[in-house]
Amino acid sequence: MAHTFLLEIGLEEIPAHVVTPSVNQLVQKTTKFLKEQRIDFDEVIPYSTPRRLTVKVTGLADKQADIEEEAKGPSKKIALDDEGNWSKAAQGFVRGQGVTVDDIFFKELKGTEYVYVKKFIPGKPVSEVLTGMKDVAMDLKFPTMMRWGSNDFEYVRPIKWLVALLDDEVVPFEILDIKTGRTTQGHRFLGEAVDVPSADKYLETLETQKVIADAGVRKAEIRKQIDDLATENNWNIVVDEDLLEEVNNLVEYPTVFAGKFKEEYLQVPNEVLITSMKDHQRFFYVTDKDGNLLPNFVSVRNGNKDYLENVVAGNEKVLTARLEDAKFFYEEDQQHTIADYVERLKKVMFHDKIGTIYEKMERVNLLAKFLGNKLGLSETELKDLDRASMIYKFDLVTGMVGEFSELQGIMGEIYARLQGEDDNVSTAIREEYMPTSSEGELPQSNVGAVLSIADKLDSIQSFFAANMIPSGSNDPYALRRQALGIIRIALDKGWDISLPLLHEAINYAYAEREDLYKNTQPITNVSETDSFVIDRLAQVLSGNKFRRDILDAVVARADMPFIQALQAAQVLSKHAEDDNFKEVIEALTRVTRLAKKAPEFGSDAVIDSTLFENDTEKVLADEFAKVEAGYGDAEMNEKFTILSSLKDSITAYFDATMIMADDEKVKNNRLLQLVKIAELTEDFGSLDKLIVK
């Protein structure tokens, strides 16, 4: 018959962001354990609250699957004595396997015969195997761990109780001094300890004690109550899914309620109000049907409706205090000019090994100026870029950002507009921080995009020059994210940004203002920074599901513009299914490999047709001449088509021509032919890294 197993790990309150990943980990480890133990089951179902991590396993088999395996013993030569009797070695082997010499058979392995026996291992009862779930529970890993008592065991929070049931029987084991049983704990204030009669009665038992253990059901209940409240008041309650997930993991029995704040606080920018409610208080904010912010908020209580008015009043009081601070800072900040704030930045350190924020802005101004010109920004955009890059960090020393650090850039844009800065300048101040995550929103304006690239480039250059380089998972200055940001912006804008261009920008800034680099002189060995950025390029491109060998090929050429690497990968992926792809790549790869053996030819070197010794040399030269002129201006897909058109000529050429001829002039002429073709293939990286079968 099928069985149901339940394991509940009762804990002190777990941080909300840890709950879901932890119970998912428990599911994965339970699944792995059952499979390794050869126990059939239907499903592993997770339940979780801030005080418990639970799995329920349905459809469990009665016992492990039986297995029959072969055990290898000594060689036949050792197993039999000179008279053909079983030796002590053979007898000891079968005794250890629980069989007799009558069960022996021989099998050859690498030319030698060995003793083998078949060994039947009956499956253990599931009740006996499930005691091993102790190790599963103890093996969970968490972002932060703690110890308690006098032991060395580490866990997310102290374990307070354990429930382990196979149907209606307790599965006995012990973690530290906590023994498994059937007694669970209800809601901290509304419930009490209660016995779970059987594994399949877990949810309904907890519901009697005001605990909704199914996180999905709990979240749906929160959403329903929010929807009912919105309908009742004709509101639009903005439900951020991440916030809903967090709130769901803060409560065991949710009750949604609404509160309000004074309308006078609506004069404070919406971004500040929303941050105060959403990020600081975990409230959902409310708008009217036209999207205008209303002086109301919605929150979730971990409990029922008893004395709810006191809860509402308490939350209103806390929010009012925060909004009063925000209103004060907003009004106070406007008493000073942008120039005042910029002046203060001269005394604020960006990093003690790098310099002040003001010095960083001066470097970024030079980098942005160079990049803006190279990328073809208009005169107006260049003017706005120059202004934005000299003030874009000013809001860091405002009172508002001091209190709400997550509003940096956002308040800069708001204050810049209030002080009459051009729209492009104001927008760029906010967009400079984009993207704020590996998949975050990108700058839309050209000014903001260049400013963002310049700032990130300066940070990477400065920290690498100061030898503060990310290693392993350690990246305290988010340099990986900043490199990803540069690449993603370049790809989004379609700009020809490459590593050589970025190095050129740094060298330009250094030449213009060497004093700004007194602590972070541009490093002469750029291979480490190049590898760092190329790794991020590969990471971005991998999101497009390109083949690994195609990725390796296109990122192998470090000087290629990022957008070209993307286009090359797209074209190679498209043509990888062509019938002749293998032959084309093999022909071109043969060219590139031999071209590497060529001496250094000058840029003005020309192929000497008088040194040709067979028709294939002339045919290939003629074919190359036809395509070379238009190749540079062709689109990437057309370039691959052009290279493919040379396949037959290249194949015939190699069939008829000995490249490494005895005559030095002839040999070099042939190598020059190959070098010129190989140079065209470099638009696709290193084709010899492609795997073709």
From Swiss-Prot:
It is found in: Cytoplasm. It catalyses: tRNA(Gly) + glycine + ATP = glycyl-tRNA(Gly) + AMP + diphosphate. One of its GO terms (molecular function) is arginine-tRNA ligase activity. One of its GO terms (cellular component) is cytosol. InterPro entries: DALR_anticod-bd, Gly-tRNA-synth_bsu, Gly-tRNA-synth_heterodimer. Keywords: Aminoacyl-tRNA synthetase, ATP-binding, Cytoplasm, Ligase, Nucleotide-binding, Protein biosynthesis. It comes from the Bacteria. Its EC number is 6.1.1.14. Pfam families: DALR_1, tRNA_synt_2f. GO terms for biological process: arginyl-tRNA aminoacylation; glycyl-tRNA aminoacylation. Its main location: cytoplasm. HAMAP family: Gly_tRNA_synth_beta. Belongs to the class-II aminoacyl-tRNA synthetase family. NCBIfam families: glyS. PANTHER family: GLYCINE--TRNA LIGASE, CHLOROPLASTIC_MITOCHONDRIAL 2, GLYCYL-TRNA SYNTHETASE. Tetramer of two alpha and two beta subunits. This is Glycine--tRNA ligase beta subunit. It comes from Ligilactobacillus salivarius (strain UCC118).
